[in-house]
């Protein structure tokens, strides 16, 4: 038996989440799994803060095809990196590392499931990368860019929220394909990162642009072939005016809308017809069968320094609520990670 610190979800949220929507508590856990079960006891090392988690904070919505609401009074959960302490599962043994869905706590008891938990085979890269670059956000970038957008060399690519966990990798994939890529972000520091660290051809601070369509026209005088959508709202409206005929839009997220009581409408949808634009929403879970192919692409390039990644690290489980809430105010620079234990 040992103590187990946890981040508890207090109650369903409307509007922007606050740190006060969570409790920090300490309970106890037995360091063993029930005899005969296929459960695995893990020690959580790193936690991932992701925008999709906001969709789980509202009241349960029977009409939702995806998000299952967090239960008040229970630990919230998300992607993390963990070490196996004890296992009743045939595929995992003590000492194994994995990434996947775990509770926001020091120790979790999980039942590993395909496409929800992945054994870590490559440990010659930072383990924290499996919360981002080599985990769900990395696979999201890969699926949206290669599988949904079907890119071609020489095409033009626009990425919103481009300095985040997904966007920074989409931009690098685009450059690897020989595309012209522009990103937007919400601060000078982030814009500079896009151009100096991630190799974007151009970037702009959307907060300093009074006319988003004009900003896109400036960056894409010949139009946009592919848009990796992370924002929604006014940005999507402006993009539709600047898309080329037969352009493709991969809809990954709409972070500008998640905390609004009434979501903003999009007014330029007729462009989809006249320009024959293909818009496709996607969920990364539909593409996890391609994870080995994804690793074959990115692992060598990480080791060769051809792919780089920026993390914003919060130390300690007690910092997790602040880190998660900050995500929705643009406070993170790069992938937001919470370190529980460094091993």
Curated annotation (Swiss-Prot):
Gene3D superfamilies from the UniProt entry: Medium-chain alcohol dehydrogenases, catalytic domain, NAD(P)-binding Rossmann-like Domain
Superkingdom of origin: Eukaryota
Annotated protein name in UniProt: NADP-dependent alkenal double bond reductase P2
One GO biological process term: response to oxidative stress
UniProt: NADP(+) binding residues: 164-167, 190, 206, 230, 252-258, 282-284, 332
Broadest EC class assigned to this enzyme: oxidoreductase
Reactions accelerated catalytically: an n-alkanal + NAD(+) = an alk-2-enal + NADH + H(+); an n-alkanal + NADP(+) = an alk-2-enal + NADPH + H(+)
Alphabetical keyword list: NADP, Oxidoreductase
Family from the record: Belongs to the NADP-dependent oxidoreductase L4BD family.
GO cellular component entries: plasma membrane; plastid
Binding site for substrate: 52, 79
Protein source organism: Arabidopsis thaliana
Pfam families the UniProt entry points to: ADH_N_2, ADH_zinc_N
CDD domains, alphabetized: double_bond_reductase_like
Subunit description: Homodimer.
Gene: P2
EC nos: 1.3.1.74
Job of this protein: Catalyzes the reduction of the 7-8 double bond of phenylpropanal substrates, such as p-coumaryl aldehyde and coniferyl aldehyde (in vitro). Has activity towards toxic substrates, such as 4-hydroxy-(2E)-nonenal (in vitro). May play a distinct role in plant antioxidant defense and is possibly involved in NAD(P)/NAD(P)h homeostasis.
Record-level Gene Ontology MF annotations: 2-alkenal reductase (NADPH) activity
């Amino acid at each position: 038996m040992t103590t187990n610190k946890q981040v508890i979800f207090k109650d369903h949220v409307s509007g922007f989440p606050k740190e006060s929507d969570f409790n920090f508590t300490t309970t106890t856990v037995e360091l063993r799994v029930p005899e005969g079960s296929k459960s695995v006891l893990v020690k959580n090392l790193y936690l991932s803060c992701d925008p999709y988690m906001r969709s789980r904070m509202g009241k349960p919505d029977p009409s939702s095809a995806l998000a299952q609401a967090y239960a008040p009074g229970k630990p919230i959960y998300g992607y993390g990196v963990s070490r196996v302490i004890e296992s009743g599962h045939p595929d995992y043994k003590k000492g194994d590392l994995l990434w996947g869905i775990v509770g926001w706590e020091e120790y979790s008891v999980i039942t590993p499931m395909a496409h929800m938990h992945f054994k870590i085979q490559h440990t010659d890269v930072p383990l924290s990368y499996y919360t981002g670059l080599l985990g769900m956000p990395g696979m999201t970038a890969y699926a949206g860019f290669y599988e949904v957008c079907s890119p071609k060399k020489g095409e033009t690519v626009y990425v919103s929220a481009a300095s985040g966990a997904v966007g920074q990798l989409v931009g690098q994939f685009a450059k690897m394909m020989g595309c012209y890529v522009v990103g937007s972000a919400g601060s000078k520091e982030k814009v500079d990162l896009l151009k100096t660290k991630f190799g974007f051809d151009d970037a702009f601070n959307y907060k300093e642009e009074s006319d988003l369509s004009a900003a896109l026209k400036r960056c894409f005088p010949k139009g946009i072939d592919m848009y990796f959508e992370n924002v929604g709202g006014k940005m999507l409206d402006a993009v539709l005016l600047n898309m080329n005929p037969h352009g493709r839009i991969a809809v990954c997220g709409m972070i500008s809308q998640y905390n609004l009581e009434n979501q903003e409408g999009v007014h330029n949808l007729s462009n989809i017809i006249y320009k024959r634009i293909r818009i496709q929403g996607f969920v990364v879970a539909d593409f996890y069968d391609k994870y080995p192919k994804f690793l074959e692409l990115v692992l060598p390039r990480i080791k060769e320094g051809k792919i780089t990644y920026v993390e914003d690290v919060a130390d300690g489980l007690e910092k997790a609520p602040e880190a998660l809430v900050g995500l929705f105010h643009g406070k993170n620079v790069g992938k937001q990670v919470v370190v529980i234990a460094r091993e």
